[in-house]
Amino acid sequence: MNSKFSVKFYEHKKLTDEIISEIIYVKSKQWKYSFDQHKKWIESNIKNEDIHVLLYSNNKIVAYSNLVSILVNFDGKQISCLGVGNVCASERSKGYGLELMTKVNEYLISNKKIGLLFCREVLLKFYTSLGWKQLQPKQYQIPLLIYEAMVFNLSRDFSLLEYNDKLF
């Protein structure tokens, strides 16, 4: 990892109001909602055990993602996975996303977890370059999904991935 960056993983229940405010600032660069709307989304969608991933540069949060505990069916077998959501950075073209996702990938590998993420088509090349695999529409059933689906750290073949919980 680049020495000018550091990454911290926080369980949601351990976040301070100050850190939540900093997260919302970074998220608002990507998604143009009000502070209160971002805060309400976090309160409604992130559980106490879910993880916030923060990339710091000069003691300032410059990129963010969250890891949410999810259950996914692979060919009818339910497996505990981590949903990777809200990947964003305070500025583009600074390498923040690369650093952040490199650490997310290391976390998934070291914790023996499969990662699932949803992204816009324009981001497929970025995530593929980091080892994520794009799922073809015939490989998954995810209601209301309007984005692309990708997996990471999946060592087995499967015919059908089913996920029926909230999008993250």
Where are these regions (language model features)?
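Short amphipathic alpha-helical segments
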Residues: 3-5, 80, 85, 113
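A conserved beta-strand-loop-helix scaffold within acyl/acetyltransferase catalytic domains
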Residues: 12-88
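Conserved acetyl-CoA-binding loop-helix of GNAT-fold acetyltransferases
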Residues: 94-106
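Conserved GNAT acetyl-CoA-binding A-motif
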Residues: 106-120
